């Protein structure tokens, strides 16, 4: 039995293309892997705090006492990291907003990137500590960006996930959503076919 963590980040709720793909992924995964456990965390509906000058102090070990706000942030960071480490498959819904991931998803990454916890520095360089995971990224875009300089999502996620130890990453794209109903429908259809392949793998 595997445990699947699904991270939603779209601010568009029911109108979200990435949300629809995520729901389809969950539906297909449950159908093909009946015994698996799925956890859904909606980072838009329940956002995590922005890492600011005060909160960053909570993420770095020190002798100074933590403020109540820092204590809350550290507890949340611990919770998010424990949740991440407890799951085998990480599904990341990452719609493209202004060429990159949503703020809500970036805030999540900022809270789980902790030296000595999810990665560490060694004489040979940084080493990821979140290993043995598989990640699936579902990314919807209004335009066509895959394999072009305007796609900042795929390179960033490969680097970040690899940095914390997750190197098995599959991408599913739904592109050209804003190009009209026909293009959008084909994008969704192609993305669902790609999801079917990922789920069956």
UniProtKB/Swiss-Prot annotation:
Keyword Oxidoreductase: yes
Catalytic activity annotation: 2 a quinone + NADH + H(+) = 2 a 1,4-benzosemiquinone + NAD(+); N,N-dimethyl-1,4-phenylenediamine + anthranilate + 2 NAD(+) = 2-(4-dimethylaminophenyl)diazenylbenzoate + 2 NADH + 2 H(+)
EC number(s) reported in the record: 1.6.5.-, 1.7.1.17
UniProt xrefs under Pfam families: Flavodoxin_2
Keyword terms of this UniProt record: Flavoprotein, FMN, NAD, Oxidoreductase
Origin superkingdom: Bacteria
Residues binding FMN: 10, 16-18, 96-99, 140-143
Gene Ontology MF terms in the entry: electron transfer activity; FMN binding; oxidoreductase activity, acting on NAD(P)H as acceptor; oxidoreductase activity, acting on NAD(P)H, quinone or similar compound as acceptor
Family: Belongs to the azoreductase type 1 family.
Subunit-structure text: Homodimer.
Protein name: FMN-dependent NADH:quinone oxidoreductase
Organism of this sequence: Salmonella arizonae (strain ATCC BAA-731 / CDC346-86 / RSK2980)
Gene label: azoR
């Amino acid at each position: 039995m595997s445990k699947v963590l699904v991270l939603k980040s779209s601010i568009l709720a029911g109108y979200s293309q990435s949300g629809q793909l995520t729901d389809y992924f969950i539906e297909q995964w449950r159908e093909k892997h009946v015994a698996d456990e799925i956890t859904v965390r909606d980072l838009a509906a329940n956002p995590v705090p922005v890492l600011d000058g005060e909160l960053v102090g909570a993420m770095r070990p020190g002798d100074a006492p933590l403020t109540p706000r820092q204590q809350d942030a550290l507890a949340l960071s611990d919770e998010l990291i424990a949740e991440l480490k407890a799951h085998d498959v990480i599904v990341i819904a990452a719609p493209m907003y202004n060429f990159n991931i949503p703020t809500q998803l970036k805030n999540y990454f900022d809270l789980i990137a902790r030296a000595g916890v999810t990665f560490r520095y060694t004489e040979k360089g940084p080493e990821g500590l979140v290993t043995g995971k598989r990640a699936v990224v579902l990314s919807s875009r209004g335009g066509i960006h895959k394999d072009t300089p305007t796609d900042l999502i795929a390179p960033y996620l490969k680097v970040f996930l690899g940095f914390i130890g997750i190197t098995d990453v599959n991408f599913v794209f739904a592109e050209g959503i804003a190009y009209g109903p026909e293009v959008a429908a084909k994008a969704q259809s192609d993305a669902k076919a790609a999801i079917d392949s990922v789920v069956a793998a």
